[in-house]
Structures are given as C-alpha cells and as structure tokens.
Swiss-Prot record:
Family: Belongs to the bacterial ribosomal protein bL12 family.
Taxonomic source organism: Pyropia yezoensis
Species lineage: Eukaryota, Rhodophyta, Bangiophyceae, Bangiales, Bangiaceae
Assembly and binders: Homodimer. Part of the ribosomal stalk of the 50S ribosomal subunit. Forms a multimeric L10(L12)X complex, where L10 forms an elongated spine to which 2 to 4 L12 dimers bind in a sequential fashion. Binds GTP-bound translation factors.
Keywords: Chloroplast, Plastid, Ribonucleoprotein, Ribosomal protein
GO cellular component, one term: cytosolic large ribosomal subunit
GO BP, one annotated term: translation
Name the record gives this protein: Large ribosomal subunit protein bL12c
Domain of life of the native organism: Eukaryota
GO molecular function: mRNA binding; structural constituent of ribosome
Amino acid sequence: MSTKVENILEELKSLNLLEAAELVNTIEETFDVDASAASGGMMMATPTSAPASAEVEEKTEFDVVLEEVPAPKKISVLKVVRPLTGLGLKEAKDLVESTPKVLKEGASKDDAETMKKQLEDAGATVIVK
C-alpha cells in the first residue's frame, strides 16, 4: 500500500461519528454517488446466501446405515432388522454380519430416527446420513 493511501486510512480512523457522516455527505455531493446504494447491495447478498443454508436444513431423505453389530447382540439386532427390511432370515443374517451396510435408502426423517432407535436399543451402532 502506498504511503499516501496509508496516510488517508490513518486519517479516516481518527474521525469521530459526526466527521465521518460529514465526509460521506461531501463525497456523495462531490462525486454524485449514493452511499446507501452500496449498503443495499450488501443487503441483497445476505438473502442469496440464506437459501443455500435453508436447502441443507431441508433434507428430507435419509439413509440408515448399520455400522457395527457386536457379536453378542447379533440375534437381537437380527430380530429388529427382519421386520424393518422385510428380508428373510438368511438375507437379514448376511446383512447383519457384513456391516457396514445401508439398511434403508431415502427414508423420511421420522422413519430413519425410529429405525435408528430400535437398532441401537438392540445393541447395534447406526448412522443416519
């Protein structure tokens, strides 16, 4: 940064509120600009970024992933997995023994949380993605 710019910046830092307001008015008149237009542009940037965060929060489909099943808990987890997935005994057993596996894709938030609670109560480690 040049010395001239640094000096101007230091002078601006030393202004009180009344002097800063007077400076803004003088700049508006001298250069025929509107300082409120600059702040309006910044206000418009905020709503643009808000929908992006709203989209993240609006996730409606979740995957329920069976991460781990301890050996002593396999039978109790198997009893929960069968009615949740509609699988037969052999298929459910294979699924429980080959973790990590996706149990259900595209489940609603309520269904995913219910499945997670039932499986965790049976002793499994579950992740909802």
